[in-house]
Structures are given as structure tokens and as C-alpha cells.
Amino acid sequence: LNQQLSSLADNLLSAGCIKFGSFTLKSGLISPIYIDLRHIISHPKLLSQVAESYQLLITNLQFTRIAGLPYAAIPIATAISLQGNYPMIYPRKETKTYGTKADIEGEYHAGETVLIIDDLATTGGSKFEAIEKLTSAGLIVKDIVVLIDRQSGAKESLGQAGYNLHAVLTIADLLNYWEENGKIEKDKIEETKLFLQNSR
């Protein structure tokens, strides 16, 4: 990892965004690692650093506006929007039953290319739901950018459907960096690598 990403990896760890221990996942599996990037919003300097790390990835991508996915990525997308002066929208998790009954909040025009911003990629399921809402509104999606790719199949499943997943960091990047620099005990790293390998 370069200096900027090493600093980001350290700050994510110290902010409690990534924890090691024993955690029950939604699927019922017991995981030795837990990634909760919602903590980022409580650390303004970290939020700014996270937004900067996305900026470096998205400068070469073609898009008209960004779409933050609810809920964790909306503040991240807002920070990116402010830093890069990109117009932003977001697809709602649930359709509004009153007022405009909108599926998508913010201004947009059919035919525009939208860059999806999310916090984490696991299998890609939630990305496909968002893509469906955006494309149903006449928007074009080519690229999805996340902070961390858990490397659990999202890149492959999105790729097969014709979408490009870009990640600031992969789980392998983080584990290798923390192991090499003695930030996390070796046995915890090994246990986590084994778990991630087996749960793919």
C-alpha cells in the first residue's frame, strides 16, 4: 500500500470500522472480522480522507453524476460530491408512498451516466438492486466504486453483467498490510483469511 492508503488503513482500524473477534453475520455465520463503515461519519477527518481516496479512483471514469447507495454510502457520496463538485442523486431503499413517490432523490435526466458509490462490496446483491432502479429511470450505469471489496464474488458477478467494480482497498490489501506492520496478531489474520476463503 502507498503512504496514503496505509494511513487510511490505520485510521479505519483505529476508528473501529474494522473489528476482529467473534461476530454473528446476517447469514448466521460466525465471522472473525466485522466491517462497519458507518462509523466513518463520526470522524470528519477520516470521512474527508475516505472521500479523497475515492477521488483518485474516479478521475479517469466517465460519468455525469454520482449515486450514493443508502444508507452507509450517502454521507461518503456527499463528501465526494463536495470535494469534486459532482452532482449527486440516490436511489431510495423503499419507494416513497407520498408526495412525489420518487424512487430516486435528486435531479437527473434520462440518458446520463451515473457512477455508483457504495461503502462495501460482498456478493454484489445490493448493487444489482440499485442498478435496476437507476436503469429503470433511463440512467446508464457502467462503474461502481467502493471503499473495501471483501472479495466474496461481487467483482466477478458484476463483471459478468457488464459492470466494472473499482475498490480503494481489498480485504487482502488490508490484512496483508496489518500483518506486515504488526497491527493485528498473526493468528487473527490467518483465521480471517481462512474464514473469507471458505465463505466465498
Task: Give the label of every model feature segment.
Residues 1-58:
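Active-site-facing substrate-recognition patch
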Residues 2-12, 132-200:
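PRPP-dependent phosphoribosyltransferase catalytic core
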Residues 28, 66, 88:
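Conserved hydrophobic/aromatic pocket- or pore-lining residues that grip, position, or stack substrates
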Residues 54-64, 131-137:
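Phosphate/pyrophosphate-binding loops at sites that engage ATP/ADP/AMP, CoA/4′-phosphopantetheine
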Residues 62-72, 145:
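Short glycine-rich phosphate-binding loop at a beta-alpha junction
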Residues 64, 112, 142:
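Conserved acidic residues
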Residues 76-115, 123-128:
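Short, glycine/charge-rich flexible loops or terminal/linker lids adjacent to PRPP-binding catalytic cores
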